[in-house]
């Protein structure tokens, strides 16, 4: 499996994900919105689909 996130990003994502799992759905949706905001940087790590 390809690691899409740099090691330096992982602790911040996990730190934000853990409280959202224990919190309300609105907290989870805020996390989802942040992941979507990060999405433009993810395709640059993937090979082209052609």
Swiss-Prot record:
Tissue: Brain.
Function: Neurite outgrowth factor.
Keyword Phosphoprotein listed: yes
Taxonomic source organism: Rattus norvegicus (Rat)
Top-rank lineage group of the source organism: Eukaryota
Modified residues (Phosphoserine): 8
Name by which UniProt lists this protein: Sproutin
Molecular-function annotations in GO: growth factor activity
Keywords tagged on the record: Growth factor, Phosphoprotein
Record flagged with keyword Phosphoprotein: yes
Phylogenetic placement of the source organism: Eukaryota, Metazoa, Chordata, Craniata, Vertebrata
